[in-house]
Structure formats: structure tokens, C-alpha cells
Amino acid sequence: MDIKEIALGQIRDSIATKQKCIDSILEDIIKAGEIVSKILQAGNTIFLCGNGGSSCDASHIAAELVVRYKSGNERKALPALSLSADSAVLTACSNDYGYEEIFSRQIEAFGRKGDLLIGLSTSGNSKNVLLALEKAKTRGVKTISLLGGDGGKMKNLSDLDVIVPSNVTARIQESHILIGHIICSIVEYNLFKME
């Protein structure tokens, strides 16, 4: 196998995973976009959390909502926050309460009835994301999980699960960011009639 074959294999695997998303979870993706739109139309806040690459995806999606998704779409800022963005809170909470509490503690502080938490986990087994989703339920915060594989321990914990049909972390992450982009596109269309 040469380098070109490796590259082509990655691209083909990515395309195949996205085709599986069209075939099996398109309606869930659209539903997620509609939920996020309604939360924002009501003036509530979107929180996002995840670990590692999923943390980066959470921050990326939050930035698209706060700033804008499509270049040239001038619109007002939307309230969205990645819970992995504040290093002081993350390190203080990790030190004082444990890493598992870094997101749930912030939901306890900031989450209000009518807000939405989007938890991202390629395995569905991230304890700190799971605890944040559980805390959200106690505060009247709606929940969406972006997962992979069989959904892990987080499956059926949220109001809506969007489970990428793959067990390959890279393919799940690629699909999660695509799902995030689709959600942002739906939001900009629903709230501002921007395509």
C-alpha cells in the first residue's frame, strides 16, 4: 500500500460514513437543527461540551453560532458557549471536585430552564459529558447528544440522540462537525432566512 492509497482510503471511508448518515440519521439531524432554532428563538442559550476532538467541535459550533456560519451572512450574535473554553474553571473544578464534574458544575451555575446542552462524545461513554446531561435534566435544560458507535452509556439519556453510524473515531468526529454545520445552517435559515 502506498501513501496515495492510504489517502484515498480515508476519503472513501469518510464519504461512506456520510452516506450512512444520509440513510439513517438525516431526520435526527434536521430535528436537532429545529430544536436549536426554537431554543434560540425563545432567547435561551446553547451550551456545548466534549473532550479532546469533541471539545474542539463544541467550540467550533459555538463560534459559528456566536459569530456566523456563512461568510457574508450578517446577523445578530446568538448565545452559545463551549463549556471547555474557560481554563480557570476547568482546572479549579478538576482540582477541587474531579475531572468528571467540569461540565456539570458549569451547567449548575449557568443552565436555566429552556436552555439547551449539546453533549458530544464519539464513544457515548464520557463520564463528564454524561454527568452534565444528567445535571441539565435537573435544571430544566433540554439536551441533545451527538454520539457514535452504539451510543454507549449516553444513549437514550438526552431528549434527542444523533448517533453517527460508525465505530471509527475520526469518521465520527468528521460527521459531528458536519452535523454542527448543518445545525448552524438550519438556524440561520429559520431565524434570519439566510441560505
UniProtKB/Swiss-Prot annotation:
- Tell me which residues bind substrate: 51-53, 64, 95-96, 121-123, 126, 173
Predominant place of localization: cytoplasm
Q: Which UniProt keywords apply?
A: Carbohydrate metabolism, Cytoplasm, Isomerase, Metal-binding, Zinc
Say if the entry is tagged with keyword Zinc.
Answer: yes
Q: Which InterPro entries does the entry mention? A: GmhA/DiaA, Phosphoheptose_Isoase, SIS_dom, SIS_dom_sf, SIS_GmhA/DiaA_subfam
GO biological process entries: carbohydrate metabolic process; D-glycero-D-manno-heptose 7-phosphate biosynthetic process; positive regulation of DNA-templated DNA replication initiation
Q: Which family does it belong to?
A: Belongs to the SIS family. GmhA subfamily.
Q: Which HAMAP family match?
A: GmhA
Its function, per the record, reads:
Catalyzes the isomerization of sedoheptulose 7-phosphate in D-glycero-D-manno-heptose 7-phosphate.
Residue positions annotated to bind Zn(2+) are 60, 64, 173, 181
Which ranges carry the SIS domain?
35-195
Q: What top-tier enzyme class does this entry carry?
A: isomerase
- Tell me the pathway: Carbohydrate biosynthesis; D-glycero-D-manno-heptose 7-phosphate biosynthesis; D-glycero-alpha-D-manno-heptose 7-phosphate and D-glycero-beta-D-manno-heptose 7-phosphate from sedoheptulose 7-phosphate: step 1/1
Protein name in UniProt: Phosphoheptose isomerase
Please tell me whether the keyword NADP is annotated for this protein: no
> Where is this chain's protein located in or outside the cell?
Cytoplasm
